[in-house]
Amino acid sequence: MTEIPSFQPPINATEVEEENAVFPTALTEWFSEVGNQVGEVALKLLSGEGDGMEVTPTPGCTGNGSVCNGTDSGGVVWDIPPLAHYIVGTAVFCIGCCGMFGNAVVVYSFIKSKGLRTPANFFIINLALSDFLMNLTNMPIFAVNSAFQRWLLSDFACELYGFAGGLFGCLSINTLMAISMDRYLVITKPFLVMRIVTKQRVMFAILLLWIWSLVWALPPLFGWSAYVSEGFGTSCTFDYMTPKLSYHIFTYIIFFTMYFIPGGVMIYCYYNIFATVKSGDKQFGKAVKEMAHEDVKNKAQQERQRKNEIKTAKIAFIVISLFMSAWTPYAVVSALGTLGYQDLVTPYLQSIPAMFAKSSAVYSPIVYAITYPKFREAVKKHIPCLSGCLPASEEETKTKTRGQSSASASMSMTQTTAPVHDPQASVDSGSSVSVDDSSGVSRQDTMMVKVEVDKRMEKAGGGAADAAPQEGASVSTVSAQIEVRPSGKVTTKADVISTPQTAHGLSASPVPKVAELGSSATLESAAIPGKIPTPLPSQPIAAPIERHMAAMADEPPPKPRGVATTVNVRRTESGYDRSQDSQRKKVVGDTHRSRSFNTTKDHFASEQPAALIQPKELYSDDTTKKMARQSSEKHEYDNPAFDEGITEVDTDSENETEGSYDMLSVRFQAMAEEPPVETYRKASDLAINLGKASLMLSEAHDETVL
């Protein structure tokens, strides 16, 4: 079988030489060579010598009706066997179908679930949309061309194909970089993120990503580089093979802006994320060390920390490795073609990296979305047929280990004994407040704050903190737990366990659950479904303790009074909240919409917990002081040090940008008839530090962060 000779345009045939006349010399020679070869083929066909000949067509063509195979820049013609076309085409088709399906599921879940519309998730949705459009515009054309072993469309279609691939490829890379930067800031600078990150700003950042990607996808359409066929001649990309200075400059810029810089940023961000998780943030570490009891630093906590570090390292390694494996081959091939090693860039070497690059659309929805519990729950809810394909959540299995961090605090407070309204009763001479926040946010985004209050009440007389125990006295432990689920349901539970005390110490047989306060009471959000109540409803703890202890001692309950310190990071949506009378009102002065960290100090002088006060009352400095003074007058309570303890309430009401954020509430109460200002300050400092620690933990270990 005789092979028809093929022809190849000279390497500089595309160069425009303005100094020559109508046709440059090189172009004239090329046309002459083509004419001679065509004539030779025609003579063989006319003479019958061409029967059974295998045609090796012109390489690199994109014209309609042409049959395109491969060639390298050295003029060597590659006869690509049909099997190679079918293998590559099938691989790209499978990759494209999986990528389109996975990213479509992510986008659909985002549209149907309002709980997913957080600023951080916008980047993930943008990535899914970009990958989906990449597969939609490139995969079908590539698969059909591979089936016919040639480019079936026009030159203009080749340019559009290359433009779509360039635009959405650049957008995906830039979005991956933005996600790594967002996670870096959330982990290392959480309070900065709280102040500056809003939905509007994230949307603006995404718009900039589109514009930036468009800036580098358009130039080849206007003469700076070009979109030409690549590999087996069944796809198109920017021209990195032509030895032209302007083309080389464009390739260099693309290499640095779309590979080198994003890759470097991702490595830097994930390295610092791992370092922060390993060593702990300076502020968080200092706060925990100051308020943590030595007994808390046990092996279990160290084991959780070790698992967190391993998990973070694995995720960082996977993300960086997948990015490098997807885009490094393409970057290497384009660099070889640009640096003058065109003879090494074969059609096979061009096609394989392109296939790797398209595979990024498959793993992105898995790494950044499907592994996140909120997305899985949304998929199970809105696409039930896929429930069996998704891994079970940790709440369902109860066996998987979830990354946890704990911040625990213990503080002993010595309080001043003061006369009370009932002459036969006395206040406690010593009390201990312990707060344990075990992980802040679980994989189901259930926020739990466990508060344990140990109060020692003496039956008669007022003794010092170190006084010997008296017969009939007791120690009560109140355990309160709050769970806030993504659906908006709030579950509160508070149990009182009283242990009688003998002259020789505590009884070995505590009375189990002498009183149960709001046991497992599920409070449906009075607000719009999906919203978490603001502020969080909680069961009054202090007053029931006093009533319970007084009942045990056969004494009338003292008037509830004391100090309550609250640290809140709350969820609001569209800046609206539901008040207690079920009337929808605009939240006035709701400072948490700007994600600023606020502390509120209020005097707890009634049985109604401060958390039930309306936000506009709770976060107003003047209103809080006024309420405190009124409470003091009502209960004949006058302490000059009290005003000193509530001199500031951070409102930060200048930036009231709407947003939707998770809520974490840490609350404890130090009960005393006349709390000295030093006790008040200790309580406030503990709550503030614990709030900061809990907030950082919840941000650091939320699945959107890693």
Curated annotation (Swiss-Prot):
Keyword tRNA processing appears in the UniProt entry: no
Any one GO BP annotation for this protein: visual perception
Keyword Membrane: yes
All ranges on the Extracellular side of the membrane: 1-86, 143-159, 223-248, 336-351
Membrane topology label: Multi-pass membrane protein
Subcellular location: Cell membrane
Highest rank taxon of the organism: Eukaryota
Residues glycosylated per entry: 12, 64, 69
Residue span of region Disordered: 393-446, 571-599, 630-658
Biased composition (Acidic residues): 645-658
Listed Basic and acidic residues bias regions: 571-593
GO molecular function list: G protein-coupled photoreceptor activity
Modified residues (N6-(retinylidene)lysine): 358
Ranges of biased composition (kind: Low complexity): 404-418, 426-442
Membrane spanning residue stretches: 87-107, 122-142, 160-180, 202-222, 249-269, 315-335, 352-372
Pfam families, per the entry: 7tm_1
Tissue expression: Expressed in Joseph cells and photoreceptor cells of the dorsal ocelli.
GO CC annotation: membrane; plasma membrane
Record topology, Cytoplasmic segments: 108-121, 181-201, 270-314, 373-706
Cystine pairs: 158-236
Keywords: Cell membrane, Chromophore, Disulfide bond, G-protein coupled receptor, Glycoprotein, Membrane, Photoreceptor protein, Receptor, Retinal protein, Sensory transduction, Transducer, Transmembrane, Transmembrane helix
Biological role stated in the UniProt entry: Photoreceptor implicated in non-image-forming responses to light. Photoisomerizes covalently bound all-trans retinal back to 11-cis retinal. Most likely coupled to the G(q) signaling cascade.
Family: Belongs to the G-protein coupled receptor 1 family. Opsin subfamily.
Protein name (record): Melanopsin
Species this chain originates from: Branchiostoma belcheri (Amphioxus)
